[in-house]
Regions:
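Active-site pre-lysine segment of PLP-dependent enzymes
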Residues: 2-5, 16, 21-41, 48-79, ...
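PLP-dependent aminotransferase class I/II
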Residues: 71-142
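Structural motif
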Residues: 7-12, 43, 88-90
Length: 142
C-alpha cells in the first residue's frame, strides 16, 4: 500500500468477497498504521462480521482506530432480511461536519416504517438476541 500513493483504502476485512478471507489482526493493524501516516482514510465495509462463528466479536477497523481515519459501513440486509435494503455509515467526527455541510441536502430514502422497525429491534435488544441466536446456530453446524 505504501508505494501506491493511494489516500483511501476500501476494504471488507471480514470474509472479503469473493475470496471469503478474513484479515488477520496484524493485517488490520497494518491498515490502521497506513491510515495514520498522512491524510489517509479507510472505508470499512463490514457487511457480514456479525455472523462470525467465533465466540468473540471480530474487531472492526473502526474500533481499533480511535475513530479518526475510518469510515464504517454496514447493512441490515444480511442480518435482518435481504428485502430490508437499509445500510448505515459512521463517520469520524471531523468528516461528519463536512458531510453535513456538503451533502446535508440529501434526504433519507428509507421508508419511515422500516426505520421504526430497525429502531425497535435495536432498542428492545431483539436485534442483539437475534444475532447471538444465529451465531450459536452457526457454531453448531461448523
Amino acid at each position: 500500500m505504501q508505494g501506491t500513493g493511494a489516500s483511501v483504502l476500501h476494504t471488507t476485512p471480514y470474509r472479503s468477497f469473493p475470496t471469503g478471507i478474513t484479515a488477520t489482526a496484524s493485517k488490520r493493524h497494518e491498515y490502521i498504521r497506513w491510515a495514520r501516516r498522512g491524510d489517509r482514510y479507510i472505508i470499512e465495509d463490514d457487511f457480514e462480521s456479525e455472523f462470525s462463528v467465533s465466540t468473540k466479536a471480530e474487531e472492526t477497523l473502526f474500533s481499533l482506530s480511535e475513530q479518526e481515519n475510518v469510515i464504517y459501513l454496514n447493512t441490515f440486509s444480511k442480518t435482518v432480511s435481504p428485502s430490508l435494503r437499509v445500510g448505515y455509515m459512521v463517520l469520524p467526527a471531523r468528516l461528519a461536519v463536512e458531510f453535513s455541510e456538503r451533502l446535508g441536502f440529501y434526504s433519507c430514502t428509507v421508508p419511515t416504517f422500516e426505520q421504526l422497525v430497525i429502531a425497535e429491534l435495536i432498542n428492545s435488544g431483539d436485534f442483539e438476541r437475534h444475532i447471538n441466536r444465529v451465531r450459536r446456530s452457526m457454531r453448531k453446524t461448523v
